[in-house]
Every structure is written in structure tokens, then in C-alpha cells.
């Protein structure tokens, strides 16, 4: 039974990480109900599960990873964005862990995220065409993207939703926005996993005691394989220039699911 739960948790991570619906919150909710985890432990586990998604990104974007140290602009982008993500995100993670111990409800920010996605979809649909390329980003714009990614440490706030939306608002074309948002995820996620091990490794130890090392490994592998499929699918959609349809759909889902969560709680 635990194996089936591990696979399901991995699939949830593998799908939700690359969609603007906050994977850590989906994992939080799923592990809370499937494993009976305390909300704060479930939040930590959701961040820890990014190990599988890191694997997906490293495999899918392996050519980009190889050229990082040969492409000064790409290296600068990753350094600036990752640094700001850490500066903003680590304190928010520590604060969030405390809030979740006091019955913080992640459905609340999910509602705001859903509304923001719908508004972003409207903005994208009716605003000027996004034709700027990634290489045209300024340092100030990289800082904004890093701050946006750092804010996503909060429960209910989507990392990909924050970074992709920020780049789209800056006029970056959808294909580049998705591509480099996913690439920026790699160092940020490594930092997230490291942060959980540094500050809340006792939470991870507790989950291991429930489903075992083999259960954790199965969940991570499931997340990795699922993520590879989802990344490819979303990048194909980004090429069609109809990203606003994703925003409308996921924004509506986020609002409905969050309202249901509030009613149930």
C-alpha cells in the first residue's frame, strides 16, 4: 500500500512542479491526507520531493547545463536569480514552517494565486505581443525574477507561476519564459532540498520512518519520470503562443480547489 502511495505522491510532484499551481502545496495536501502528516511536516516533505523534479530538469535541459560555464550571460542569470531566491526564500521558509505549526491554511494564498493567474491570462491575451528574447534581460529584471522565485517559498505560491508570469510581463516570449524558468529551477530546488535538510531534517526522518527509504526512492523516481513528460508537453504549448489558455484553466482550478479546501477545513 505504501508503494502505491509513494508512486501517487511522485506523480503529483512530477505534474504539479511544472504547472503554476504550487507543487509543494499539492504535496502538502496529498501527504497530509494519504500519510496523515502534520501540516508543517507535509510542507517540508513537499519541498524535499523536489529531488525528483531536479532530476527531470537536469536530464531534459542537460545541453543547457553543459553550456552554463561557457555562456557568461546564462551563468549571470542563474547566479543573480539564485542569489535573490535564497535571500528572499530562506527566511520565508523558516517563517512558513512556524506558521504551519499554527494551523496556517495554504488554501488562502492558492485562491490569490488562482485569481492572479486568471488576471495574468487576460493580460497576456490582450496586451502587446511578447517578442523579447531571454538574452535581452537586464540585471534589474533578473533581480525581479529572483525575488519572484524567492516569494514562492510561501505555501500556496507557485514557483513556475511566479517566474513565468514575471518574464511574460517583462515581455519575454513564452517559449523562452518557460524554458529559462525551468532552468532557473535547478539551483533553486537544490537550495530548497538543502534548506529542508539543514533546518527541518527531523521532519524528513519522520516520513522515512513511515514509508521507508525505498518508498522515498520510489516517489522520487516517479516524480522524475512524470516530470520529463510534463516538461516536454508544456514547452510545446509555449511554442503555440497560447499560454493564456493555461493561465485561465489552472487559475480556475486553483480557485475552485482552494475554496473547496476552505469549506472542508
Curated annotation (Swiss-Prot):
Task: Provide the membrane topology annotation.
Answer: Multi-pass membrane protein
Q: Which compartments is it annotated to reside in?
A: Cell membrane
Q: Which UniProt keywords apply?
A: Cell membrane, Hydrolase, Membrane, Transmembrane, Transmembrane helix
Q: Which residues form the signal peptide?
A: none
Q: For this UniProt entry, which segments traverse the membrane?
A: 41-61, 75-95, 104-124, 137-157, 180-200, 215-235, 244-264
Q: Which GO terms describe its cellular component?
A: plasma membrane
Query: What does this gene product do?
Result: Catalyzes the dephosphorylation of undecaprenyl diphosphate (UPP).
Q: Which NCBIfam families match?
A: PRK00281.3-5 (NF001398)
Q: What is this protein called?
A: Undecaprenyl-diphosphatase
- Source species, please? Saccharolobus islandicus (strain Y.N.15.51 / Yellowstone #2)
Q: Organism classification, top ranks?
A: Archaea, Thermoproteota, Thermoprotei, Sulfolobales, Sulfolobaceae
Amino acid at each position: 500500500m505504501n508503494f502505491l502511495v509513494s508512486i501517487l505522491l511522485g506523480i503529483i510532484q512530477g505534474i504539479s512542479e511544472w504547472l503554476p499551481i504550487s507543487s509543494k502545496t499539492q504535496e502538502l495536501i496529498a501527504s497530509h491526507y494519504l500519510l496523515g502528516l502534520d501540516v508543517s511536516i507535509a510542507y517540508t516533505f513537499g519541498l524535499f520531493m523536489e529531488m525528483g523534479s531536479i532530476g527531470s530538469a537536469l536530464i531534459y535541459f542537460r545541453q543547457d547545463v553543459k553550456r552554463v560555464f561557457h555562456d557568461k550571460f546564462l551563468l549571470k542569470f542563474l547566479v543573480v536569480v539564485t542569489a535573490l531566491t535564497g535571500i528572499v526564500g530562506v527566511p520565508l521558509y523558516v517563517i512558513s514552517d512556524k506558521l504551519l505549526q499554527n494551523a496556517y491554511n495554504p488554501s488562502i494564498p492558492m485562491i490569490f494565486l488562482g485569481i492572479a493567474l486568471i488576471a495574468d491570462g487576460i493580460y497576456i491575451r490582450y496586451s502587446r505581443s511578447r517578442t523579447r528574447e531571454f538574452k535581452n534581460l537586464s540585471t534589474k529584471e533578473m533581480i525581479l525574477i529572483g525575488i519572484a522565485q524567492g516569494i514562492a517559498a510561501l505555501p500556496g505560491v507557485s514557483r513556475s507561476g511566479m517566474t513565468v508570469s514575471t518574464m511574460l510581463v517583462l515581455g519575454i516570449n513564452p517559449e523562452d519564459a518557460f524554458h529559462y524558468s525551468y532552468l532557473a529551477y535547478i539551483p533553486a530546488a537544490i537550495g530548497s532540498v538543502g534548506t529542508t535538510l539543514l533546518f527541518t531534517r527531523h521532519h524528513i526522518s519522520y516520513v522515512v520512518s513511515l514509508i521507508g527509504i525505498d518508498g522515498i526512492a520510489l516517489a522520487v523516481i516517479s516524480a522524475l519520470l512524470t516530470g520529463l513528460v510534463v516538461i516536454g508537453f508544456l514547452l510545446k504549448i509555449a511554442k503555440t503562443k497560447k499560454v493564456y489558455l493555461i493561465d485561465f484553466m489552472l487559475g480556475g482550478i486553483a480557485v475552485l480547489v482552494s475554496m473547496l479546501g476552505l469549506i472542508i477545513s
